Amino acid sequence: SKKYNKSAYALHNLNLTLNHGQIIGLLGPNGSGKTTLIKLINDLLTPTEGTVLIDGELPGVHSKNIVSYLPDHSYLDGSMKIQDLVSYFADFYEDFSEIRATSMLKDLNIDQTARLKTLSKGNQEKVALILVMSRDAKLYILDEPIGGVDPAARDYILHTILSNYNEHATILISTHLISDIENILDRVLFIQNGELVL
C-alpha cells in the first residue's frame, strides 16, 4: 500500500506476482495508481505498508541491474547527440547492446549525430524506447510507451518491444490505450482507485 501524506491510499492492499516470460498490461484510467506502482517497483517511492520484492530481493542495487525502466516523461538530456546517449547507456549498463541500439536507430533512419531535442516528439520517444529495449534485462517497465505517438509509430513501438526483449524476461506495460496493445498481452492487470480489480 502507498499513501501520500494523510490523504487516501494511492494504492491499497495490492498483492500480485509478475511471472517470467510474460508481457503484462497494467491498465487503468489516469490517476488510478499505475505510476505509483511503477515507482514503487523502481525504488522511487517507499511503500507505506508491505514490501516489494524483485527477483526475491528488496529494490536496490540488484534490482537496478536487472530492471530496464522507461518513465512516462523523458529524463534524457535533449542537448546530447543520439550516438552519445547510446555510448552513455553502454558505459552505464553492462547488459546494454550497442549493436542492437544502433541497428534499430538505423531501421528508423534516425541520424545518430543529431541532438535529441532536434527530433520530433515521436522520434524522441522511439529513441528512449530503443535505449531501454537494448538492455538484456529481466524486467522491462514501460510507463505509457505509446501515449504520445501516432498509430504508425505505435505499431513500430509494439514491434520493437516484441522483437527485442529476452523471452525469459517480464515486460510490464502501463497504458490507458487498452485496445492498442491487448493483442500482445499474456496477462492484464487493471487498477482502479488504487486497487487491483482484474
Regions found by a protein language model. Name each.
Residues 50-63:
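Conserved ABC transporter NBD signature motif
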Residues 72-127:
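ABC-family P-loop ATPase nucleotide-binding domains
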